[in-house]
């Protein structure tokens, strides 16, 4: 399970790095100013470093997630609310977790890091959580735009993509 999560984190980081490279190329094509081209390169490098940092954080989180609970007598150490901080098994101490669920104490997590990712091009979604109210396709349980979805329940007369041959 951990290796699958690590592979997913690597794939996501790879996609973010590729996206940063493509955005740099677009920005460089749009301008002739060498300063703007240099700024585009710097933005790309910053985005790639941020993607690598998030990948490493996810790997660290995946490696410690199974050890955080520790469990007491007759317990697993896990609760429905997340981590059981009372019995940390040597991980995390009495610290909390950041907004993505990563431990902030004893993990080497940089608490001074800026998490303003609104300029990354993916809406600034830093929560990493999905709602469970029937709209799992949308980050943070954002309301879906029903007008852009294909309606297959109303029959063929309501389906704008239906073609009768």
Curated annotation (Swiss-Prot):
<protein>
    <recommendedName>
        <fullName>Late embryogenesis abundant protein D-113</fullName>
    </recommendedName>
</protein>
<dbReference type="GO" id="GO:0009414">
    <property type="term" value="P:response to water deprivation"/>
</dbReference>
<feature type="compositionally biased region" description="Basic and acidic residues">
    <location>
        <begin position="14"/>
        <end position="60"/>
    </location>
</feature>
<dbReference type="GO" id="GO:0009793">
    <property type="term" value="P:embryo development ending in seed dormancy"/>
</dbReference>
<dbReference type="GO" id="GO:0009651">
    <property type="term" value="P:response to salt stress"/>
</dbReference>
<feature type="compositionally biased region" description="Low complexity">
    <location>
        <begin position="1"/>
        <end position="13"/>
    </location>
</feature>
<comment type="similarity">
    <text>Belongs to the LEA type 1 family.</text>
</comment>
<feature type="compositionally biased region" description="Polar residues">
    <location>
        <begin position="132"/>
        <end position="155"/>
    </location>
</feature>
<feature type="region of interest" description="Disordered">
    <location>
        <begin position="1"/>
        <end position="76"/>
    </location>
</feature>
<dbReference type="GO" id="GO:0009409">
    <property type="term" value="P:response to cold"/>
</dbReference>
<feature type="region of interest" description="Disordered">
    <location>
        <begin position="92"/>
        <end position="165"/>
    </location>
</feature>
<dbReference type="Pfam" id="PF03760">
    <property type="entry name" value="LEA_1"/>
</dbReference>
<comment type="function">
    <text>LEA proteins are late embryonic proteins abundant in higher plant seed embryos. There are two subsets of LEA proteins (5a and 5b), the first ones are expressed when the cotyledon weight reach 80 mg and the second set are expressed above 100 mg. The function of those proteins is not known.</text>
</comment>
<dbReference type="InterPro" id="IPR005513">
    <property type="entry name" value="LEA_1"/>
</dbReference>
<feature type="compositionally biased region" description="Gly residues">
    <location>
        <begin position="67"/>
        <end position="76"/>
    </location>
</feature>
<dbReference type="GO" id="GO:0009737">
    <property type="term" value="P:response to abscisic acid"/>
</dbReference>
